[in-house]
Amino acid sequence: MPGNSPIYYWDTCLFLAWLKDEERPTGEMDGVRDIIERSKKRDARIMTSVLTTTEALSARIPAGMDTLFQQMMRRVSRVGIDIKVASLAHDIRNYYAKGGGKTLSTPDAIHLATAIIFRVDEFHTFDGNGSRKSLGLLPLSGNVAGNRLAICKPETKRPQLDLRRPNPPSE
């Protein structure tokens, strides 16, 4: 039933992984493809920020994939950045900046704030390790600056056998 379908917030990296058909550890891309198929059947809803469009189209994606991306985005709920989102994103960045170590990038803070405000069921990302300067998102699951948010990789209900590569990369 569409009204009871789970709402999954997608970080930009998932759209990029799908557009580039990235080679990822076994099962990860199956999760991406499964959620896309479920959204086509209205068994799940994908939400993201309008920021994703800018991030995805400024990335290096294969020729012609921008059209495919635009078609896919018709089925995705895109949320604008308003004062509530901006304020919470600011608070989230400040919370992690207080530690003096790694912080969150502004786009990551906007994505997290949007997901929190819209009370999604899960925030999906592959961002586990972050970078030298930025925190990864997966380790924040459960408590994002004092806000409850489940953060995970998308999981499939029907794993596929990938015969394209004999040795899948490890994390």
Segments predicted by a language model, with ranges:
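Acidic, PIN/NYN-like endoribonuclease modules and their adjacent C-terminal/linker elements
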Residues: M1-I7, D30, D34, I117-E171
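Short, well-structured N-terminal submotif of metal-dependent ribonuclease cores
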Residues: M1-T48, S58-Q70, Q160-E171
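Active-site neighborhoods of divalent-metal-dependent phosphate/nucleic-acid chemistry enzymes
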Residues: P2-G3, R78-L135
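Short catalytic/ligand-binding loop motif for oxyanion handling, primarily in non-cytosolic enzymes
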Residues: A17-W18, E55-L57, S131-L135
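Active-site-proximal loop/turn and secondary-structure-junction residues that shape catalytic pockets
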Residues: T52
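Short, hinge-like loop/turn segments at secondary-structure boundaries
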Residues: A63-D66, Y96-K98, L140-N143
